[in-house]
Amino acid sequence: MFDPRLRFIVVPDKGLDADFVFRLDTATGKLVAAETASVLSRPGAGPRHAAFHPTAPYAYVINELDSTITTFRYDPERGGLTPLQVITTLPPAFTGNSTTSEIAVSSSGRFVYGSNRGHDSLAIFAIDGATGVLSTVGWESTQGKTPRFFAIEPSGTFLYAANQDSDTIVTFRVDQATGKLVPTGQVVKAGSPCTIVFR
């Protein structure tokens, strides 16, 4: 995932439990290890995907295997990542098996979303504007099985959840004030959807 200035890229490595940072050499197009080349995660966390705050110096990594999100302070000049917080993506009472998949920050920079495969939900978090840390808003069922991916369309009005094992893409309206998701009733059949791209 490139940072908003397209200077650095963060690469989560699930197998090594680490987040690697590279700098883009614009003269050659090559990726070069950043000054702080990697940050270790907790053993067994399984970092999967990263997302940057659009305007503030924060990055968020969703950890697949322990169903958490790590909040980082991000140094846009050197590409450094400093861990600030780890928060679960699952409700306290949930005891089943679940892994995470996708993460996204709203275009407003006010909310973070993460998908849970097993709990089959989207976890919703509010971002503290002063510190970047997350607080849980709630969870919304994806109305399907195994939400491998989701995407927020460019205006930030709608979120689309791709349920891989129920062959559906479900549309939600994003409440701009609370970050909560409201099902629109629109469900599209699609064979094992695993990604959504807006062009």
Regions found by a protein language model. Give the residues of each.
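Intrinsically disordered, low-complexity linker/loop segments enriched in Gly/Pro
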Residues: 1-25
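Beta-rich, blade/repeat-based domains predominating
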Residues: 1-8, 41-58, 89-109, 143-158, ...
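Conserved beta-strand positions in repeat-built beta-propeller and related beta-rich domains
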Residues: 3, 11-14, 53, 61-64, ...
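Short loop/turn segments immediately following the C-termini of beta-strands
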Residues: 14, 24, 64-65, 74, ...
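Short loop/turn segments immediately following beta-strands, especially the blade-tip
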Residues: 22-31, 72-80, 124-133, 173-180
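Beta-propeller fold detector
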Residues: 31-39, 81-89, 133-141, 181-189
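C-terminal hydrophobic structural anchor segments
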Residues: 123-173
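Blade-level signature of beta-propeller repeat domains, shared across WD40, Kelch, NHL, RCC1
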Residues: 164-173, 177, 182-199
